[in-house]
């Protein structure tokens, strides 16, 4: 698990991001495809499309919003999220999205939060996100693979 201070920092963090889930989610996917261009092939709706085409898609905004809301759910329930995380692992395995994508996406989330929050994204929040991601979220999802 993570400490009470880390949980609080994470909840403060996601509270800011969750005020604009669609905008932040879209930014997250754009950043993900900028940092990992090959990952777009894992998304049937965007496979073979340019980043500009993806940016113009309503689907990126809608799916991005769902992802941010789900991430908020994980974070707000971080110390009791094992069931949610396991089911998300199983769901993503069923879509042929391996756990390695989740193991390697933290730099994307970190960069997106920094971009979206600016100076409000503190070192404590960054450290808490890393601790939660590597110590709770990825292991929880692995249980579903």
UniProtKB/Swiss-Prot annotation:
Pfam families: Globin
Protein source organism: Liolophura japonica (Chiton)
Keyword Heme: yes
Subunit description: Monomer.
Span of domain Globin: 1-145
Signal peptide: none
GO MF, any single term: oxygen carrier activity
Record's protein name: Globin-1
Binding residue positions for heme b: 63, 92
Superkingdom of the source species: Eukaryota
Keyword set, alphabetical order: Heme, Iron, Metal-binding, Muscle protein, Oxygen transport, Transport
Family, as annotated: Belongs to the globin family.
């Amino acid at each position: 698990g993570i400490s009470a201070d880390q949980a609080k920092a994470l909840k403060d963090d996601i509270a800011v991001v969750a005020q604009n889930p669609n905008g932040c989610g879209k930014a997250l996917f754009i950043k993900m495809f900028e940092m990992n261009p090959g990952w777009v092939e894992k998304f049937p709706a965007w496979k073979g499309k340019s980043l500009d085409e993806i940016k113009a898609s309503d689907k990126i905004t809608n799916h991005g919003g769902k992802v941010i809301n789900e991430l908020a759910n994980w974070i707000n329930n971080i110390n009791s999220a094992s069931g949610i995380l396991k089911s998300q692992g199983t769901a993503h395995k069923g879509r042929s999205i391996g756990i390695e994508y989740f193991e390697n996406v933290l730099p994307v989330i970190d960069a997106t939060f920094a971009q979206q929050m600016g100076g409000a994204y503190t070192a404590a929040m960054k450290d808490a996100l890393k601790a939660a991601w590597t110590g709770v979220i990825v292991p929880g999802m692995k249980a579903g693979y």
